[in-house]
Structures are given as structure tokens and as C-alpha cells.
From Swiss-Prot:
Name the UniProt record assigns to this protein: Transcription factor FapR
Cited function: Transcriptional factor involved in regulation of membrane lipid biosynthesis by repressing genes involved in fatty acid and phospholipid metabolism.
UniProt GO molecular function: DNA binding; DNA-binding transcription factor activity
Name of the gene encoding the protein in the UniProt record: fapR
Any one GO biological process: negative regulation of DNA-templated transcription
Source organism per UniProt: Listeria monocytogenes serovar 1/2a (strain ATCC BAA-679 / EGD-e)
Family indicated by similarity: Belongs to the FapR family.
HAMAP family (UniProt xref): Transcrip_fact_FapR
Chain ranges passing through the membrane: none
NCBIfam families per UniProt: PRK04424.1
UniProt cross-references to InterPro entries, sorted A to Z: HotDog_dom_sf (IPR029069), Transcription_factor_FapR (IPR017275), WH-like_DNA-bd_sf (IPR036388)
Keywords of the record: DNA-binding, Fatty acid biosynthesis, Fatty acid metabolism, Lipid biosynthesis, Lipid metabolism, Repressor, Transcription, Transcription regulation
Length: 189
């Protein structure tokens, strides 16, 4: 692996983050062959915020006006892509406040909340309520893992104000949750 001077590394770091604002400090450290602490110091020197803040910024700039069914700050997880009535993706980092203290396993309601709020966000109406949900937890999620939830809207089968949204949540390539959400929706009068 090529060693970069501090100046070169910082320039390449800035480019890498501009190209992919969702890259982690750990991935950057591996890419540049330095410690995570060195990456953090470089980010601070360049006034580049940590990953969580970068994600919030991208989401608020790109999706704040797109989501109609609930305020963007009420979405559990960070929306990184959304096409109303079609699909959406969000990420959720499991931290210490989301897990059972004794075994560091994420509490199920956090996984459900991420999936349910994503199913709500993908509905293009001002009112979107979950009428029924069928959820299967496939495996436990641990502190420090990142959950990527992907929602897909099924094509409408009739004119009812009910839409079915399928959500699958992953840690890496492994499914951790599968859910089917029946969403009632309407436009406020």
C-alpha cells in the first residue's frame, strides 16, 4: 500500500468523502493505511464533520421536501435515498442506547421503528398510517452494527387507500428483518 504525505492524504481524504459521504472512518483508515485516529484528526483539520453529521446533512438537503407523510426528523434512521411510491433506503447505527445492557443486542422496537418509519416515508400523501404489519426478526443485531433498511412499494391492486410496502433490513449482506406494512393514506383537506 502506498504511503501518502499528510498533505496528499488529506487532499485524497477530502475527495474520497466528497465522492462517498457515507464512507466510515474505519474504511478510510483501511484505504489510506493509517489509524482511525489519524483519519479523525485529518477530518477535524479539514473541518469535515463525522459520518453521522454528513448523513444528516445529505438527507436534509436531498429529502426534507420529498417526504410528505412525516417530518424528516421523525424518521428513525437516516434516509439516504427515496423515490415516493416506489422505494426508499435508510441507515441506522446501533449504539449503546439502543441495546440491552447485559448482552449488547439491539432492542427489537428500534428495528421495527426504522422499518415502519421508512414504509411511512415512502408514501406520497400527507397522511400515512400503518393499519397492519407482519414482521419477522431473522437474526439479532448487535451494538456497533449498521442496519440498512430497504423499502419497496407493491403495485396497487385496486383503488383503495391502502398500499403495501415490503421492507427488508440488512446488516452487511445478511437479512435481519423482513416486514410487510399495510399503509392507509390520504391527503389532508
Amino acid at each position: 500500500m502506498k504511503k501518502y504525505s499528510k498533505k496528499d492524504r488529506q487532499m485524497k481524504l477530502q475527495v474520497a468523502i466528497e465522492e462517498n459521504p457515507f464512507i466510515t472512518d474505519e474504511q478510510l483508515a483501511e484505504k489510506f493505511g493509517v489509524s482511525v485516529q489519524t483519519i479523525r484528526l485529518d477530518r477535524v483539520a479539514l473541518s469535515i464533520p463525522e459520518l453521522r453529521e454528513r448523513i444528516k446533512h445529505v438527507a436534509s438537503v436531498n429529502y426534507a421536501d420529498a417526504v410528505k407523510s412525516l417530518p424528516i426528523d421523525e424518521v428513525i434512521g437516516e434516509i439516504i435515498d427515496i423515490q415516493l411510491s416506489k422505494s426508499a433506503i435508510s441507515i441506522f447505527d446501533v449504539r449503546s442506547e439502543h441495546v440491552f445492557k447485559r448482552n449488547k443486542i439491539a432492542r427489537g422496537h428500534h428495528l421495527f421503528a426504522q422499518a415502519n418509519s421508512l414504509a411511512t416515508a415512502v408514501i406520497p400523501n400527507e397522511i400515512a398510517l400503518t393499519t397492519q404489519a407482519t414482521v419477522r426478526f431473522v437474526r439479532s443485531v448487535n451494538e456497533g452494527e449498521r442496519i440498512i433498511a430497504k423499502a419497496k412499494v407493491r403495485p396497487a391492486t385496486d383503488n383503495r387507500a391502502i398500499t403495501i410496502v415490503d421492507v427488508k433490513s440488512y446488516v452487511g449482506d445478511e437479512i435481519v428483518l423482513k416486514g410487510k406494512f399495510e399503509m392507509y393514506h390520504a391527503t389532508q383537506k
